[in-house]
Amino acid sequence: MPANPELLISPKQRQGGGYEQLAADFLQQQGLRLIARNWQQPKVGEIDLVLIEHGRSWNVLVFAEVRKRKLLGYGDALASITRSKQKKLIKTARYFLRHHPEYADFECRFDVVGFTERTGRSGQGEPLQSEWLQGAFLAPAW
């Protein structure tokens, strides 16, 4: 094993991990409980964060996608979740539920946590704007 496994991670992956950590921290501050991070089903896809939101009457399993955008010319971070990406996330979530039958009775929800860096007049990046979109898209019947 390499002495420094971070060397095997691209700068983009390292940066993405930082935003995933920001999102995980934020969602946990909102009362959600993190149960999985970067959950993968080979040849299908990956889910950035899997969390549980405990309600009074029921629990919700939250599959969260974390996005970061630098330029608004292409839309904000939330706009980057295409229909194709939604289908991939839904398919991966189904595999997650097959691997974790203990969550079979939970309601499921797909959220997006988006970070957008705004570029100021100086050309320098300004503080990130974050947005949490609960129920960002719906899955067909499970």
From Swiss-Prot:
Example of a GO MF term: nucleic acid binding
InterPro entries: Restrct_endonuc-II-like (IPR011335), tRNA_endonuc-like_dom_sf (IPR011856), UPF0102_YraN-like (IPR003509)
Signal sequence bounds: none
Gene3D superfamilies: 3.40.1350.10
Disulfide bond residue pairs: none
PANTHER family reported for this sequence: UPF0102 PROTEIN YRAN
Family under the similarity heading: Belongs to the UPF0102 family.
HAMAP family: UPF0102 (MF_00048)
UniProt name for this protein: UPF0102 protein PsycPRwf_0497
Lineage of the organism: Bacteria, Pseudomonadati, Pseudomonadota, Gammaproteobacteria, Moraxellales
